[in-house]
Amino acid sequence: MITAGCGSRAGDDGASAAAQDSCVDTSGDTVKVGAINSLSGGLAVSESVIRDAITLAVEQVNASGGVLGKKLELIGEDGASEPTIFAEKAQKLVQSDCVAAVFGGYTSASRKAMLPVFEDSNSLLYYGQQYEGLESSPNIFYTGATTNQQIIPSLDYLKEQGVKSLYLVGSDYVFPRTSNAIVKAYAQANGIEIKGEDYTPLGSTDFSTIVNKIRTADADAIFNVVVGDSLNAFFREYRSAGLTAEQMPVMSMCVGEEEVRSIGAPTLVNQLSSWNYYETLDTPANKTFVADFKAKYGADRVTSDPMESAYTAVHRSE
């Protein structure tokens, strides 16, 4: 798929100009591919581990003979938790480094910032994070969960547990706001009261006002779409306010195994999380993935949904 898509869409004669302008070189024994993940900033806790999964997958693809006999050369960039930097790095990878495809992006804001780069150059982005839908592009492979695969099942579960009211909280960008719009529509159709809704800037560490409002609202549960380092601050304030999972559980959309390590497992006892993948998935393929990852990076390391999605995306290039 990578070598077939270098600069042109299969069967798309209208893309011939873009193909002629492409600087991707497939004449040698290697093909360059890129990775853009936040290795610094507030999202590094969630994104840096995704780079590890991508690196492992590239090594495995190369060990098995590469793509159409060509080894992959990985060029990595730091998105620094800023959408504008993601766009700048995407342009560098496509126009200067001449990569055949890019793996990366985390927030919907970073994906949307990069989208014009890939469409204008007719290049490929493999986006492995969950996303809100409402967008499609022939230049993006969306390999993460959509809302009907993550948000709706989590709401169904809360409803089954007798939840009659929710407080919505999220980081302030596209995915959390769109997710909560879906939550509100679901709530209206299912007789669930929305007690409140608040957003905080990416990277925010002050949740005192929001958590105080949550505590006062006394909802049955919290629907949480906060991401990155902000999760640590949110749960720290949640505990400081005397809230517990038994009193007001938190259903999180962006807390996976790596975030549990960062926040601390004792803080998250009996809390809820919704993902398409967990490290404990009992299949031969996952056991191999987890074993290979730990063999490379250490027995104490964990795998998560975004990591698995990125890892799988690289292997789809074979």
Residue ranges and their predicted role:
Residues 86, 143-166, 177-178, 205-208, ...:
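Hydrophobic alpha-helical segments within soluble ligand-binding/sensing domains
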